[in-house]
Amino acid sequence: MELKNLAQTLLPRLVEIRRHLHAHPELSGQEYQTAAYVAGVLSSCGLHVEEAIGKTGVVGQLSGKGDDPRLLAIRTDMDALPIEEMVSLPFASRHPGVMHACGHDIHTTLGLGTAMVLSQMGHRLPGDVRFLFQPAEEIAQGASWMIQDGAMKGVSHILGVHVFPSIPAQQVGIRYGALTAAADDLEIFIQGESGHGARPHEAIDAIWIAAQVITALQQAISRTQNPLRPMVLSLGQISGGRAPNVIADQVRMAGTVRSLHPETHAQLPQWIEGIVANVCQTYGAKYEVNYRRGVPSVQNDAQLNKLLENAVREAWGESALQIIPEPSLGAEDFALYLEHAPGAMFRLGTGFGDRQMNHPLHHPRFEADEAAILTGVVTLSYAAWQYWQNIAI
């Protein structure tokens, strides 16, 4: 109850912080003012602050007074999106074409709020808490930058949070197992031979072969992949040809590949190349497949999930807890931290309960109910407070 009362007392300041961040969004890798603002708040709370971690990231370490060697990290992200805000708010974006349309202003506020609460309890914390304020989540590079600069050194476990407008504010969603998908980039080049549109038998039609490749890939997903292990392959770009009466000799396709299970993720490059090779060899074309690993799936740790569940129940009661039944095929570079320490990410509801529709993330009319701020800060604070008593080494 003491943590909750502290957070409640700080709420006006937290709303002020959130509105400042929302009005001053910065794109991925350009979070200079945001980082300086975050560092200033952390320093005022007495944390040890390191700036320029992961380029524009910030790390704040709160020292407990106990001797427990386990180090808990709490990660939030800071970057905005290249979207023109269409919500008429007194604190709407002041930067044309840039908007906090994914709630990272809320996330940053939650990290700062939790640091503010726990800093007032630091003399009673059994161990240390490290706060990671990450840049460039939207381009899936910030986590790797932070890790390369040592942000995860010594970390035992890590917690993360993401807002979710389809969950009502003042509710928390917990997902056991896979929360989000692995996301990779795919690029395919088809090389045929040009010819007159009236004489296709004298050419190798790269556009037609590309169509066969697309069809073969989609058919193979439904016939050769385990339907209980979801994956999605979406080709969102295709280009080729120079004139309507000339058979194209080159086609480029590009898209995204999403999967939930590590075993499926591991075999995708070879599986895709095999299908492309078979089609192209059948029709005499050459090909090139460029498969670029993005981020793996977020696989939540059961111990950390139970810690979050207990925190929600103790702070807010059973009615505030949702167990999420299905994962998302969206991606989150929080997964990269989980390659270095077990962890869990939860969904924080930001939906307005009195609205028929809450606009989704990445929408120019996305809006978050600020009641979520108290819920998120208290949940993270309770989880951190209980961490050393409930999580095994």
Swiss-Prot record:
Its EC number is 3.-.-.-. Keywords: Hydrolase. InterPro entries: Amidohydrolase, Bact_exopeptidase_dim_dom, Peptidase_M20, Peptidase_M20_dimer. Belongs to the peptidase M20 family. PANTHER family: METALLOPEPTIDASE, PUTATIVE (AFU_ORTHOLOGUE AFUA_6G09600)-RELATED (PTHR11014:SF63), PEPTIDASE M20 FAMILY MEMBER (PTHR11014). It is an enzyme of class 3 (hydrolase). This is Probable hydrolase sll0100. It comes from Synechocystis sp. (strain ATCC 27184 / PCC 6803 / Kazusa). One of its GO terms (molecular function) is hydrolase activity. Pfam families: M20_dimer, Peptidase_M20.
